[in-house]
């Protein structure tokens, strides 16, 4: 199994990229997966008092690494692309348990275009979306400006994704990995123009 990691910004074309990649029979690119959280919390538990009382480093490494192996055990493709926007902020976890040479694919788009895409989607859908539900729980008024502020503030989907990506650069973790940015603009160009 060769693992790659899709950590694209929301509304930046990662679903389109996934659909394109899945046309190759040797690649499986899935939707958002729980693999990161499974590995992160397993690693966290193994650093706590009970595990450290009688440490078993090799067993601990196997426990955490097995999360990604087991999650994709139903797949036969040699290239597996796990999707989670948190990966850039936790490259150390990838290096420790998956590969010394992680490859991250990140679809990117201008933040204002991301927000505009969300707002368009919300209006087109016409139902109560996850942003509106969260805002109502916090007693916020549902306006497009408030939605944008909510998504761009800490805890918001756009801010969290951009912060995870920025963390990789702040911690200088991108120097020793393959970081593949994919621009939404280039991804959506008409095929005849991009060839």
Name these PLM-found stretches.
Residues 6-8, 80-83, 106-108, 179-182:
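Short beta-strand segments
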Residues 61-74, 116-187:
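PAPS-dependent sulfotransferase catalytic domain
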């Amino acid at each position: 199994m060769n693992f790659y990691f899709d950590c694209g910004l929301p509304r930046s074309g990662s679903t389109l990229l996934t659909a394109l990649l899945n046309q190759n029979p040797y690649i499986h690119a899935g939707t958002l997966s729980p693999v990161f959280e499974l590995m992160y919390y397993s690693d966290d538990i193994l650093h706590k008092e009970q595990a450290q009382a009688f440490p078993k480093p090799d067993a601990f490494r196997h426990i955490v690494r097995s999360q990604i192996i087991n999650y994709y055990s139903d797949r036969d493709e040699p290239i597996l692309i796990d999707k989670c926007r948190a990966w850039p902020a936790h490259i150390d976890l990838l290096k420790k348990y998956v590969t010394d040479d992680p490859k991250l694919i990140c679809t990117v788009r201008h933040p204002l275009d991301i927000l505009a895409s969300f707002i368009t989607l919300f209006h087109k859908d016409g139902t109560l979306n996850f942003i509106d539900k969260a805002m109502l729980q916090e007693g916020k008024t549902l306006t497009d400006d408030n939605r944008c502020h909510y998504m761009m503030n800490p805890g918001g989907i756009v801010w969290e994704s951009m912060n995870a990506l920025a963390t990789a650069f702040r911690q200088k973790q991108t120097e020793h990995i393959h970081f593949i940015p994919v621009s939404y603009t280039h991804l959506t160009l008409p095929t005849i123009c991009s060839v």
